[in-house]
Amino acid sequence: MFGSSSTGFSLKNFLTGALLLCSSSSVSAKSSNQWIDIWGCMPQLVEPGNLPPAPYNGGDAVFKNATLRQTVYITQDASIIRLSFSNAFGGSDLPITAATVALPASGTGAGSSAIKPGSTKTVTFSGGRPGFLVPNGALVVSDPIKIQVKAQSVLTVTLYFATGQTGQSITGHPGSRTTSWLAPGNLVSAADLSSSAAGVASTDHWYFLSSIEAYQPERASALYIVGDSITDGRGSTTNANNRWPDQLLARLQKAGRSLSSISIINQAAGGNRILADGLGPNALGRIERDVLARPGNGVRYALIFEGVNDIGTAPLDSVSQQSVGDRLISAYEQMITRLHSGGIAAFGATITPMSGPGQAYGEPEREKTRQRVNEWIRRSGRFDAVVDFDRAVRDQKNGTMLDKRWDSGDYLHLNPEGYRVMAEAVDLKIFERFAEGVEVYL
């Protein structure tokens, strides 16, 4: 019988213990902290020309018996992080054998092959396992790692693949504007890959690493930017982190207050389109993966800055251009609706100039479409706020062209100073206005 004093078993004590256990679990579940992204990139299928250099792209496998060292630019201070690795586009399982994180060596930064002595932390998975076999199409998250990182600083992530990934279909982000290092053998803890072994190579791409999350206070939040090569940093300086989102981050950090607790997550890729797959999945489809499905309650803001590649690759005739303009506007409406359903403020950015000698995107019919779409972005009232990049960087005498001071040379992408002007065009008050996100719209 329950409650017998002779056995020492008490129903009352049993229930009290059970309630305490449940209470403890509930307190943990309701912690005021959250996991939130502090770095990210848009995973995509790596094109043949962007695979790692020989001998790391052999016919049967990529990265076979190879160490890969990559650096990323952190956007928020943190002391506990975890890493996500994507095999979304892999044609086979991705066998991660070992991994570490570290700080770059003193006096170095983005693109460095060297790490700071004593800063290395071993990365584990699923409760302490040293590696993970990531199924094709899947994503894996590491165990939490205690390491102090600062906003606008660099973190080094090193991976070792004993057998490599079979085939030539792998996941990565070619437009890293950051140098990565490769070496034969397991060198995840090596002080400097460039002097560790023969056969060391470098490439300006990222592979497999898709996000870094941090365990942050509830006040922390994030801006996700859905964009194309202009946001991905074409025309910026390799290893300098001077894309326009990087320079916007500098403004937020300098502003302090609540603004310094906003991460910026660059979910852009060169050649990306809203209405059709190209270099990476179309933005209308990937907004679920790249924004809505991201962790934490801090996903407060999203900025949509795409459309130039849809206009520029659509046929030149007026009927086709009328159609692509109409479809872009409808797609913006869909993206806004879906962001609002998640309580996320939806910001829109006007499409920047794309005309110039020999620039096919700047044909008159395409320019008409750009102007029409921009007027809708500015005047429809559908976006919660508008960032007028077009007005900020266009030539004051010929609004169809970039100001020559900001042009990287192709009449489409900007140089680092132009990206500074874009970053300055963002009114920081919009982040305070929508600090709690938005109400869920009917």
Model-found features: residue ranges?
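Catalytic His-Asp segment of secreted/periplasmic serine-dependent ester chemistry enzymes
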Residues: G312, T352-L442
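Catalytic nucleophile-elbow at a beta strand-turn-alpha helix junction centered on a G-D-S/GDSL motif
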Residues: A220-P245, G270-R273
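Structural recognition of the beta-strand scaffold that forms the well-ordered cores
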Residues: R82, A222-G227, T231, I262-A268, ...
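Short connector loops at secondary-structure junctions
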Residues: R257-L275
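Extended, charge-rich intrinsically disordered regulatory tails
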Residues: F305-G307, P315, G342, F347, ...
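Fungal secretory targeting signals
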Residues: M1-K30
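N-terminal secretory targeting modules
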Residues: V27-V226, S236-T238, R257, F434-L442
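Oxyanion-hole/transition-state-stabilizing segment in secreted/luminal serine hydrolases
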Residues: A269-R327
